[in-house]
Amino acid sequence: YYSDWYPINYLHQKVTKSSLDFVYPTDLGLKFKEVNLEAKTKTEVTDGITTNTWQVEDLEVLTPSYDQEKLPKLLLAPVKFSIGEFQGEMNDWAGLGMWQSKLNAGRGQLPEDFQQQILQMIQDLDTPYEKIEVLYEYLQRNFRYVSIQLGIGGWQTMTAQEVLENKYGDCKALTNLMKSMLEVAGIPSFYTLVYAGVDEEDIEVDLPSNQFNHVILQVPTDSGPIGLECTSTLNPPGYLGDFTSNRHVLVTTPEGGYLTKTPAYQEDHWNKILTETNVT
């Protein structure tokens, strides 16, 4: 994926002129979005190679009090792309969601003995929420967050079997395991991409591209979707916290992907989370 372009990089520095030449094979395609950017542009195509040029002049000097939402920037993304042997297109969010789903296909199988263990844990429970709660708490008690990303591992999850054996995984791996556990319980759920971080800006919803850095699990219910932060050992099911709340996320399915938004939490509606820790 492509880096964004920020023509202003430092505080108290005058930018008299800055330009970007972006050269790419024409058949890959290019999507872009100019944000607060008034640039002179030029496009040239020669022998199947396209060069797009943006040039800005006499930009405002940044100070510490500068409104970051007014910062000029250029967002870039390919239409066609490949990572490893997996090719995809980002004409729309559905295309990116389908690519992510294909990337993780076949990596959720659980051994028969563990499937039986799951069924035993939920055999006396009546409602889907009760089953979600028990399995989520099992995940929180027995697995820990460790991020190891080799090769395509920055995008593709570890297998559920590997997480079971190692007792750890990153956000992708823990989410994939939780999804697989719920599937055994007969509860559908969706691997969901999000740009996480406290007080982070929302993604650009009109530029379908990989703007994400984290994964959560979304579980549809009759009363609305439940979000599971599978790297947390404390959150109750359905509570995401300010790390991923109130922002657009990409829900992925084998048929494609679609955007939805995580809940916003108002201070006067907050619940307390009380924990008791014994250290010996």
Where are these regions (language model features)?
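Secretory-pathway-linked proteins and extracytosolic
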Residues: 1-148, 280
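Short, conserved helix/loop micro-motifs enriched in His/Cys and acidic residues
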Residues: 112-116, 144-167, 197
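Extracytoplasmic
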Residues: 15-17, 49, 212-214, 246-247, ...
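Hydrophobic/aromatic-rich core segments of domains that either
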Residues: 173-264
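Active-site-proximal structural scaffolding
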Residues: 13-14, 111, 128, 132, ...
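Active-site-adjacent structural elements in folded domains
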Residues: 102, 122, 146-150, 158, ...
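Long, His/Glu/Asp-enriched segments that create or flank divalent metal/ion-associated functional microenvironments
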Residues: 259-264, 268-279
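Active-site-proximal cofactor/substrate-binding loop regions of enzyme domains
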Residues: 132-134, 138-140, 158-169, 174-189
